[in-house]
């Protein structure tokens, strides 16, 4: 380990004290100490290996940079021992540079590796924080101004997943939206909410609650005569560019818009769990469509929402909450305009559903020839390929052991049999076999 190199500490004046302390480190627990020559050999070797850093003074930054490069090297088998000595000496010098006093080079190596791991974790956290900050639409610039960025696709997909798994008005979606939307513009919040998967009736109710919040704001906050003050259009981001909506003077408007959305989600969620909620009114088994429609309309009329929302719920829920038979009958009768058809038209289309005539009609359609299972093709045998039976019922390939004919089994044979179960008449006889020795000549 002890290697002497010409020159001295004058080549590295910034490391004079560091080398002095490094000479107190033991190479092994019961071995000799590092020498000044060992330290100079290490430094000069590293300068030779990494010439692009040769002119830089040996600071903590340079030590860590060189350590990262040395750590990623893979030495040849013949140079492995010298490489380990180089790495251990570098670790000892790094510890002395940081003010530590390791007893042996093994302690120095362990200390540097542990310190390096902590620094890497901090860098990963910093990168993660920068990545999270980069997905927010409003970015604060160094000069103090603000710029706008589109909502990150990863964040949008996470919100979509939560909405699909837990529901658009669930507490999980509300928490996720409140966390992400703190730096969104009002336009971003409303556009993302509109693109989320969910029940159309729920979205109409949410929009109705937002309209109620806007109307309440107009009543309680009339515009002052001298101008100024927030308007509903500013809060909802109407008529604004994204760049203008991202500025600091619109922070209050964005916060109010987010609070309105959260209030709307909570209100619709409470409606969904309240007894008499029209979205929970579904047609029961064997219930006439007229009775179901009467219950549904009564529940919708009792809702504290505006008349346009009531009309929308009547058109939507009168189809989506109906039974499968009624939905099929409406599709068959009303066609593509089933969603826009009035409740009276749907009642007219479903008046015969459940009657004996309707059941006979369904049975006749099911038994209509030429419409078997699958894609409308008649049922065919996989054995012979002929229609009308299955492979387990196929007679092709079966041979009767009584008469020898194909197409039926012995127990189904109509041929004559004797009293003992044998076929009457002279049966076929094969050639008689007589045992004999083989001819030798």
Swiss-Prot record:
Q: Which GO terms describe its biological process?
A: viral budding via host ESCRT complex
The UniProt record lists the keyword DNA repair? no
Against SUPFAM superfamilies, the record matches this protein to: Retrovirus capsid dimerization domain-like, Retrovirus capsid protein, N-terminal core domain, Retrovirus zinc finger-like domains
Q: Which InterPro entries match?
A: Gag_p24_C (IPR045345), Primate_lentivir_Gag_pol-like (IPR050195), Retrov_capsid_C (IPR008916), Retrov_capsid_N (IPR008919), Znf_CCHC (IPR001878), Znf_CCHC_sf (IPR036875)
Give the UniProt entry's GO cellular component terms.
viral capsid
Q: Where is this motif: PTAP/PSAP motif?
A: 435-438
Q: Which GO terms describe its molecular function?
A: nucleic acid binding; zinc ion binding
The cross-references to Gene3D superfamilies, in alphabetical order and at most eight, read: 1.10.1200.30, Human Immunodeficiency Virus Type 1 Capsid Protein (1.10.375.10), Zinc finger, CCHC-type (4.10.60.10)
One of its Pfam families is zf-CCHC
Positions of the region Disordered?
419-441
The record's keywords, sorted A to Z, are: Capsid protein, Host-virus interaction, Metal-binding, Repeat, Viral budding, Viral budding via the host ESCRT complexes, Viral release from host cell, Virion, Zinc, Zinc-finger
Q: Where are the zinc fingers (CCHC-type)?
A: 379-396, 398-415
Q: What is the UniProt domain comment for this protein?
A: Late-budding domains (L domains) are short sequence motifs essential for viral particle budding. They recruit proteins of the host ESCRT machinery (Endosomal Sorting Complex Required for Transport) or ESCRT-associated proteins. Nucleocapsid protein p14 contains one L domain: a PTAP/PSAP motif, which interacts with the UEV domain of TSG101.
List, alphabetically, the PANTHER family matched.
ENDOGENOUS RETROVIRUS GROUP K MEMBER 24 GAG POLYPROTEIN-RELATED, PTHR40389:SF4
Spell out the protein name for this chain. Gag polyprotein
